[in-house]
């Protein structure tokens, strides 16, 4: 009997729930909240069939105990809005399982370690003007409603942009679905963004992050990218309408369209490679700056490929 088979036989939904809900110290602070645990049990009783099926499927993934240790909120994820508005509990369960089934299908290599790591992994490190440092990381999604993975761009160790996504099936194809695009924390002023843009020759942090993202998912053999808009972001769900009204102000559509993204139904279909301006179309006095911009983008591509292959 293999270790994987043994792990699957020993691990079951009851044991999984006991370990995340009853064992202290709790594997995630939310499980330590009595209100959260009560809500979890109540929601399980409201949707028993889908919940039991989901728990069984989780326990039949490869090395399920290790996965739950690294992602302790997985049992509760189907109970709350996920990825975008209107996604029912069955579709939420399917999306989560599709992501981990896809990720676990990889051979044992750098990519798989990055995708399943419980910590952030460096994907790119580069320098801008004046010794400014830009680092891009991949790690578990810190915004648990927006997917399973997050890429984070840091400027001189300050996070300025985060892109959250999952690998799911859509219209019969494997895609990367971007469900969140966050800027810096509230305490980070706009001057930091201006400094980062200036030190990267006019490249916005989100633009650099998207270059890293497209390179990374290509390394994962995924060519199709879709994204939510600000109108169907998960926080537009009715239950968050007033709670998040003042905090959610992002205009996703504007950024997607700047990348030549195309609206397809409720989602945007995004390019897997952003087209660059031809040299002859750039005014001569700006060509030197554009060369430096493209050098930074090329460096990001090289760094991501180097760290993930």
Annotate each predicted stretch with a short phrase.
Residues 122-130, 134-138, 214, 223, ...:
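Generic preference for hydrophobic/aromatic residues in regular secondary structure cores
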Residues 2-195, 288-309:
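Non-catalytic substrate-recognition and accessory regions of acyl/acetyltransferase enzymes
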Residues 161, 170-263:
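Acyl-donor binding region in acyl/amide transferases
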Residues 122-125, 235, 239-240, 274-279:
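Charge-rich, low-complexity amphipathic helices
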Residues 254-309:
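Charge-rich, low-complexity intrinsically disordered segments
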Residues 74, 87-88, 207-208, 217-223, ...:
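Noncatalytic linker/hinge segments flanking ATPase motor cores
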């Amino acid at each position: 009997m293999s270790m994987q088979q043994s792990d699957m036989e020993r691990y079951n939904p009851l044991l999984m729930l006991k370990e995340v809900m009853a064992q202290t110290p709790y594997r995630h602070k939310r499980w330590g909240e009595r209100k959260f645990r009560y809500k979890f049990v109540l929601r399980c009783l409201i949707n028993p069939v889908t919940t039991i099926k989901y728990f069984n499927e989780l326990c039949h993934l490869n090395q399920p105990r290790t996965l739950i240790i690294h992602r302790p909120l997985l049992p509760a994820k189907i109970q709350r809005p996920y990825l975008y508005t209107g996604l029912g509990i069955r579709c939420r369960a399917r999306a989560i399982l599709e992501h981990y089934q896809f990720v676990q299908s990889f051979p044992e290599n750098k990519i798989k370690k990055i995708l399943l790591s419980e910590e952030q992994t460096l994907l790119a490190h580069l320098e801008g003007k004046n010794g400014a440092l830009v680092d891009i990381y991949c790690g578990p999604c810190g915004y648990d409603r927006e997917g399973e993975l997050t890429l984070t761009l840091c400027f001189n160790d300050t996070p300025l942009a985060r892109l959250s996504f999952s690998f799911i099936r859509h219209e019969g194809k494997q895609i990367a679905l971007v469900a969140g695009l966050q800027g810096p924390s509230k305490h980070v002023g706009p001057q930091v963004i201006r400094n980062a843009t200036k030190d990267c020759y006019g490249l916005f942090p989100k633009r650099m992050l998207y270059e890293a993202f497209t390179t990374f998912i290509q390394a994962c053999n995924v060519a199709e990218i879709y994204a939510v808009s600000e109108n169907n972001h998960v926080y537009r769900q009715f239950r968050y309408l007033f709670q998040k009204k003042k905090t959610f102000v992002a205009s996703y559509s504007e950024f997607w369209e700047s990348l030549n993204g195309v609206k397809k139904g409720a989602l945007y279909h995004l390019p897997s490679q952003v087209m660059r301006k031809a040299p002859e179309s750039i005014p001569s006095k700006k060509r030197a700056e554009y060369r430096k911009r493209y050098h930074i983008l090329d460096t990001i591509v090289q760094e991501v490929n180097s760290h993930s292959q």
